[in-house]
Amino acid sequence: MAEWPILVMVLQEILSMRETEPKMDLLAIDDFDGELQQLIDWAIRMKNDDGFADSFKPLDGMSIGSIYEKPSTRTRVSFEVGVSKLGGQPLTLLANDIQLGKSESIADTAAVLSRFMDGITYRCFGHSDVQELAKHSSVPVINALSDMHHPCQAAADLMTISEKIDSVKGHVSWVGDGNNVLHDLMLACASLGIDIKYATPIGFEPDADIVSRAVTMASDLSLIHI
């Protein structure tokens, strides 16, 4: 999962716009709409500049709630460290700790948490669930993983590539199933002007609608299924 610097910058970017109308949510990587490269550059700076990291506290006095329907090690640690590094207070809510899906609906949960939290992250099964939470939440919502999208992971992958080579301009290849990470990598590569080639087994191709979105975003780039 992502190193904490990229999650720090995701949190800062989304929560800095919490007072805007409409509020900004991160449900898929293309929600950043042209700001992804700047976010990656700032995350690398925060990782390498201790002085900057120590003084950059935009979440001072804020509380961030993180709901986990799925077990997590790296995602949970990264979000908790990221919120703390930005001066905020992380609150982790495991599936068995709250009434979500039992006596309370997603809409009810969103309304309650919005009264106490400045932002919400949600690691869930169905992507429609995080969409529903964002719809009814009055504070920003970040998708910490759904069956369709994993935006923070894709951003972290591209951050790592940026650290290892001078420029991510060129080609990225993916071998494996067409899962949530591939979906956001395709959208991110389209946003950044990177050609991506992917090889997936028959029956495990990426979602056709997301492929179409990526192609529409980057008509002059190569998105090749091998």
Put a short name on every predicted segment.
Residues S63, Y68-R115:
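Active-site cofactor/substrate anionic-group-binding motifs, chiefly glycine-
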